[in-house]
Amino acid sequence: NNCPGDWLPMNGLCYKIFNELKAWEDAEMFCRKYKPGCHLASIHIYGESLEIAEYISDYHKGQAEVWIGLWDKKKDFSWEWTDRSCTDYLSWDKNQPDHYENKEFCVELVSLTGYRLWEDQVCESKNAFLCQCKF
């Protein structure tokens, strides 16, 4: 584990919640600029999902939802991760994703589900966000 103190180590990567509110694209750019190879977080198994949820519940200040790196770039329900990892696990909240009013193409962790489940959201919404890095 080479993660700095306030990062969550998991499966060879490090994760950190940033509490400043940003639109999805700005959050992804922030993660990328933080260090080469960083992105908004991708989640691939239920266990990771739970560990991340627990970490966010401990360290997230405020009520904002939390961006992760999943988005519908083509706007056709073909979800992809910004780190280009495979979309092999999805943890949608009920009746999600719904592209509500054909405006929701970015994915957030839902605070009401303890950050365990996901929903699509308007990409311009300002949220806290979860970066993933290798150190």
Swiss-Prot record:
Residues 10-132 form the C-type lectin domain. Ca(2+) binds at residues 96, 98, 104, 120. It is found in: Secreted. Expressed by the venom gland. Pfam families: Lectin_C. GO terms for cellular component: extracellular region. Keywords: Calcium, Disulfide bond, Hemagglutinin, Lectin, Metal-binding, Secreted. Induction: Hemagglutination activity is inhibited by D-lactose (MIC=1.75 mM), D-galactose (MIC=0.75 mM) and D-raphinose (MIC=3.5 mM). Is not inhibited by D-glucose, D-sucrose, D-maltose, D-mannose, D-fructose, D-threalose, and methyl-manopyrosonide. A motif (Galactose-binding) lies at residues 96-98. Negative results: does not induce direct vasoactive effects in perfused arteriolar mesenteric bed, and does not potentiate bradykinin contraction in the ileum. Galactose-binding protein which recognizes specific carbohydrate structures and agglutinates a variety of animal cells by binding to cell-surface glycoproteins and glycolipids. Calcium-dependent lectin. Shows high hemagglutinating activity in the presence of human erythrocytes, which are agglutinated with a minimum hemagglutination concentration (MHC) of 2.5-0.35 ug/ml. Causes indirect nephrotoxicity. Causes reductions in perfusion pressures, renal vascular resistance, urinary flow, glomerular filtration rate, sodium, potassium and chloride tubular transport. Belongs to the true venom lectin family. This is C-type lectin BPL.
